[in-house]
Amino acid sequence: IAEQLENALLRIRKPYSTQVKLQPVADATPSSQLPSLSGGTGWVNGDPVTSEALRGKVVLIDFWTWDCINCQHTLPHVRDWAKKYESQGLVVIGVHTPEYPWEKPLSSVKNAVNKWQLPYPVVPDNNYNISSPF
């Protein structure tokens, strides 16, 4: 009986394939339009940047907040990429999206930008006008 059961199971079981087929996560073509970067509460480390000015460029937009431990772990890497790849055309924009009221003052964002020595423009997004469309 065990042999008959085994044979029956083998007949109904789909063959197992060890071949891996990779699928793209997203379309390789750029999206049609970058959401607006307006609506922040000021800019640190430079003048306001518009989506139109970034058209055709390789852009990394880093959403972070200064009191987030995960953000604190990634900021040095983003900073290093900004420095390392700037000459090759990478543009980094920081969007500070506060979680708590004490993270909202522009002076707090400026202190964090100085502490982490961020060389790229950062816009505080206290009302989530910038981050929401993303």
Residue ranges and their predicted role:
Residues I1, N7-E52:
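N-terminal "domain-start" segment that seeds a small globular fold
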Residues P35, Y120-P121:
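Structural signal for short hydrophobic segments within the conserved structured cores
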Residues S38-T41, V58, D67, A82-Y85:
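Sec/Tat-exported extracytoplasmic proteins
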Residues P48-Q72, V78, V92-V95:
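Short active-site neighborhood of thiol/selenol oxidoreductases, capturing the structured segment around
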Residues S51, I130-P133:
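Short conserved loop adjoining the S-adenosyl-L-methionine
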Residues R55-K57, S87, L118:
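Active-site acidic short loop of glycosyltransferases
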Residues Q72-W116, P124-S131:
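Structural microenvironment flanking redox-active thiols in thiol-disulfide oxidoreductases
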